[in-house]
Amino acid sequence: RLILIRRFCALVTAGYYTIEQRSEKYRIIFLNTNLWLNTADNRMLHRFAGSMIDNAHDPFEQWSWFQKTLETARRKKETVYIVGHTPPGIDDRQSGAAVLSEHHNTKYLQVIRLYSDIIRGQFFGHWHTDTFRVVYSDTGLPVSWIMMAPSISPSTPGGPNNPGLRLYKFETTTGQVLDYTQYYLNLPDANSIGTANWLPEYSLLEYYELQEITAIALHDLADRFTQLNDYAFVRYYAANTVSLPREVEQIWGCGGPLNVVCALHHYCTVTRLNPESYKECYSSYALTFASTGPSTPRLYFSLHLLVLLVCAELLRYR
């Protein structure tokens, strides 16, 4: 009873808590990422006028609680999933924009690396887009994944999307996430007929031709974004905007038609989860493209091939 009281107090006071499936040894940790936002976006900071929120240290002692909870889970040999609102990393709709403060973004990634042996996956939202992220070890190995489902709200500062709902399939005894089905509402059609008709958009494993949901599998998927002979990025981008009509997507998406720069931006946001590493990723690849020269036949052929693949895939899936 005392444990329940403490958890309730933490939830009411600061919005974070954990639940356990003790018989099967898995745990879900719910974080209040509002406590870790940068100063401009931190509503909690404005609400309390800074008196109870120190954004440079440990607001409401969430970090201390988070790491103690992970230590307990490791000692009990539990599998852990993490749920929050605002994810670490860069907004894929707004180049280079991060919402968590630099301190908390860096610390979060460090904690995930440290406990990657028990953290099976992470679930976030906030950006309204259908996307994912891969967390890497200090030596560059993929060690954890983040799933971000699109929102029901059809609008976002970075561009619109159709409303989306996601249903995860998981193994009840271990908590292992096996797959998910993404549903969407075709908003123009719904407005036209006056009825909401939710339809399956895709299933993760089939859509991206994956065998399982792991950090390595999602790393390989992101790597396919940079390969000109692969449809992965075209499919990803269609899902990213929740099957937005092409005429709307052309206005908002990547500043126009899909291209190498667009694919590069999304590849770097998926695989580089802090502003500096994102900038380094984007700059290094952009420099590689630029060094080939605009008149190089090989580059021209590659870009032409990419356009043909994009057109073929859009005709196939739209």
PLM regions and their residue ranges:
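Active-site-proximal segments of metal-dependent phosphoesterases and phosphodiesterases across multiple
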Residues: 41-64, 71-124
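Metal-dependent phosphoesterase/phosphodiesterase active-site architecture
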Residues: 1-72, 76, 129-318
